[in-house]
Amino acid sequence: MKVENPGSFLDHFLRQTRIHHVQLSGMADMKANMMLTVASVVLTFTVGYLADPAFQWAALTLIAFCFASIVAAIYSVMPRVPLPSKNGARHDMKDPNYNPLFFGTFIHMTLEEYNEVMEHAVNDPSEAVELMVREIYTLGCFLAYRKYRYLRWAYLLFLSGLLIAGLVQALCVLLLNLGIEPWHIHLVPASPAGG
């Protein structure tokens, strides 16, 4: 990447873009934590309805969807950092995964190697800008394909669970009103007659 006029405008532009991405990451984490809390509370309250034959099917449906939503929300906030390899780092600017500004990359380097890479970058404005642009790009891809993708699934699963559980409950009530008793799961042993 060739930079014609590195200056304060470019620095401000790159800094603001990076700050925006970091704020989006924080918002995604906050939303995932909210979904974890809400789905966990709903799941906890719903478990009590499993023993009631009138609500069993709706409760099972809601529990399944809440659990799936919790898993998606956890996956959204779960850190993904490559473990250090024994092969050493590849210091190749042509490698799209090479980003010495990200700790997941420089944990593969010795301090001397990292100092050398950073010295070269800070003394070459074009390379420094390329590293910053690459970091913004990889952070944006991570947000789009990892955080927000699974966060969206968490919210969709939770909303679907609420709607489907409501429909299941309405169907069970309709069947009972028609005199058809839906099949019940006996989670609690029946008490003996007369005892």
Q: Over which residues does each language-model region extend?
A:
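Cytosol/matrix-facing amphipathic helices and coiled-coil assembly/linker segments
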Residues: M1-F45, A128-L143
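Solvent-exposed, non-transmembrane helices and loops of integral membrane proteins
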Residues: M1-S8, N87-T138
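Phenylalanine-focused residue identity feature
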Residues: F9, F13, F45, F55, ...
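Broad hydrophobic/π-residue packing in well-ordered secondary structure
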Residues: D11-L14, R18, L24, L60, ...
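Histidine (H) residue identity feature
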Residues: H12, H20-H21, H91, H108, ...
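Alpha-helical transmembrane segments and their immediate juxtamembrane boundary regions
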Residues: I19, Q23-K86, R149-G195
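Loop-to-transmembrane boundary segments
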Residues: V122-S160
